[in-house]
Amino acid sequence: MLGLDACELGEQLLELLRLALCARVLLADKDGESTPSDEVLDEIVPEYQAPGKKSMLAIWQLDPGDVSLVKYKQALLGPLPPIMDPSLPNVQVTRLTLLTEQAPGPIIMDLTGDLDALKNQVFVLKEGIEYKVKITFKVNKEIVSGLKCLHHTYRRGLRVDKAIFMVGSYGPRAQEYEFVTSVEEAPRGALARGLYVVRSLFTDDDRLNHLSWEWHLHVCQDWKD
């Protein structure tokens, strides 16, 4: 970085700090660590002003002649994803799958088509079984922080359960991501059997509604009921 004046050097250091924060965001959920907010950073670094969010393209185009910085960005962010259709949303949720070895067949919810049609479908779950939820999604353009999936479950008009799955933070890439929850147990007993309405939401730390949909779950005594 020879030849930079003090202001330019300061901008470079701030951008490197920005990249380091991106790394913390991408790895926080794996390590179980929390990511420092801009407010905390302001206290750690006196007179620090948090930079505005930069696009992935802008980050990649920063100092293309600095070999060490280019290598650092490649290790941190991975390859620059191919140019996507600008009409595509940044986050696309494609499927929700219930994983259980006890089911007679796959239980897959396609989220790329007519979401209203899901209201007319009933997904059957045998009482008392153990299962996991797999969420399949894509990130197309920019880093997204704090993805989470919420499920509000209703029976006879009353909310009986609220589940929040912390999915994490991800950068754009051509391949889909998959997130699998920990093991859940379906309710059991005569009082638990019946039809449930589930309202699901896929959102993030910025509270953007990436996808919301409603579906029906029938807890039965047996798969054939």
Swiss-Prot record:
Keywords: Cytoplasm, GTPase activation. The keyword Cytoplasm applies. Signal peptide: none annotated. GO terms for cellular component: cytosol; membrane; plasma membrane. Gene3D superfamilies: Coagulation Factor XIII, subunit A, domain 1. Pfam families: Rho_GDI (PF02115). Detected only in brain, lung, kidney and testis. GO terms for molecular function: GDP-dissociation inhibitor activity; GTPase activator activity; GTPase regulator activity; Rho GDP-dissociation inhibitor activity. It is found in: Cytoplasm. One of its GO terms (biological process) is regulation of protein localization. Its main location: cytoplasm. SUPFAM superfamilies: E set domains. Inhibits GDP/GTP exchange reaction of RhoB. Interacts specifically with the GDP- and GTP-bound forms of post-translationally processed Rhob and Rhog proteins, both of which show a growth-regulated expression in mammalian cells. Stimulates the release of the GDP-bound but not the GTP-bound RhoB protein. Also inhibits the GDP/GTP exchange of RhoB but shows less ability to inhibit the dissociation of prebound GTP. Belongs to the Rho GDI family. This is Rho GDP-dissociation inhibitor 3. It comes from Mus musculus. The gene is Arhgdig.
